Amino acid sequence: MFGQRLDTLGAMSSSVSSPSPETGKKILLAAPRGYCAGVDRAVETVERALEEYGAPIYVRKEIVHNRYVVDTLAEKGVIFVEEASEAPEGAHMVFSAHGVSPAVKEEAAAKNLQAIDAACPLVTKVHNEVKRFDKQGFHILFIGHEGHEEVEGTMGHSLDRTHLVDGIESIPGLPAFLADEPNLIWLSQTTLSVDETMEIVRELKKVYPQLQDPPSDDICYATQNRQVAVKAIAERCDLMIVVGSTNSSNSVRLVEVALQAGAKNAYLVDYAHQIDEAWLDGVQTIGISSGASVPEILVTGVLERLAGYGFDDVEEVTTAAEKIVFALPRVLRPAR
């Protein structure tokens, strides 16, 4: 297993390195970064399914939001489809780490698909909260990004009582009756910016003073701790490079967090070759992080490319240690 839990350390630690005396150029490497426990579980689920059942294995949507991971699995015999109905009758299908709605599971059952759910357990936790609060008669204000697979899957568990809040600007468009609704609670997508989410909550409470907080935070440990790690180095950086795909919510948020925390510039790249040499003009210190669905090999590629431009002194700045591991879906666990 590869995923690990993040427990904030009492003091930030770093590997000590001095800028090159010749160039003064330096890289600050944020830690933790990259794969989280939920992504580890999802990718290993697909790999184990290939070993157990052979190709092809069908996956609804992208198993995780990373181009390299998807392309690598496709080369091994994974077929990615938009909907369960696109898979042939009786095929093996894996649901992505982002979770699915009951309607998707019903669609898979109608085609007798051998479904394996690779949803991150932290996403499943939010699904269970939605179902519980729906059953208790609450209306739910769900903070998230419209069209994101996690949002669609989560809201599918309470179609009539869950209302999407996609940014502060969407608040005026919420149903008018919610102003008089006594049982009102907010929940959120797991991969949002912590600061942005709480800003939205503050605005919601101005409109809905009765709005209740959830019993626990929905933004996942990996998302939060990667943001903390970026904040720890951003102010020292002339440039921040985040490795991740444009459809990865948590990766995009890291770019935003870096800029808000003081980085002079920040870019998102899938691969090292996407780094534009012009970005490096006048730059002495570069910060590097990666989203929760990014394998470390892609970060290594970025470090190697930057070394070619004289950025060969690397200081890893660690703000937390990761120890969490999620078990595979039961059907793929080794027999005891």
Swiss-Prot record:
Chain residues that bind [4Fe-4S] cluster: C36, C120, C220
Cofactor annotation remark: Binds 1 [4Fe-4S] cluster per subunit.
The protein's Enzyme Commission number: 1.17.7.4
Region ranges (Disordered): 1-23
A Pfam family per the record: LYTB
Pathway: Isoprenoid biosynthesis; dimethylallyl diphosphate biosynthesis; dimethylallyl diphosphate from (2E)-4-hydroxy-3-methylbutenyl diphosphate: step 1/1; Isoprenoid biosynthesis; isopentenyl diphosphate biosynthesis via DXP pathway; isopentenyl diphosphate from 1-deoxy-D-xylulose 5-phosphate: step 6/6
Residues that hold dimethylallyl diphosphate according to the record: H65, H98, H148, S248, S249, N250, S293
Molecular function as annotated in GO: 4 iron, 4 sulfur cluster binding; 4-hydroxy-3-methylbut-2-enyl diphosphate reductase activity; metal ion binding
Residue sites binding (2E)-4-hydroxy-3-methylbut-2-enyl diphosphate per the record: H65, H98, H148, T190, S248, S249, N250, S293
InterPro entries, A to Z: LytB/IspH
UniProt keyword Metal-binding present: yes
Key words, A-Z: 4Fe-4S, Iron, Iron-sulfur, Isoprene biosynthesis, Metal-binding, Oxidoreductase
Biological role: Catalyzes the conversion of 1-hydroxy-2-methyl-2-(E)-butenyl 4-diphosphate (HMBPP) into a mixture of isopentenyl diphosphate (IPP) and dimethylallyl diphosphate (DMAPP). Acts in the terminal step of the DOXP/MEP pathway for isoprenoid precursor biosynthesis.
Annotated NCBIfam families: ispH_lytB, PRK01045.1-3, PRK01045.1-4
Protein name: 4-hydroxy-3-methylbut-2-enyl diphosphate reductase
Organism: Corynebacterium efficiens (strain DSM 44549 / YS-314 / AJ 12310 / JCM 11189 / NBRC 100395)
Gene that encodes the chain: ispH
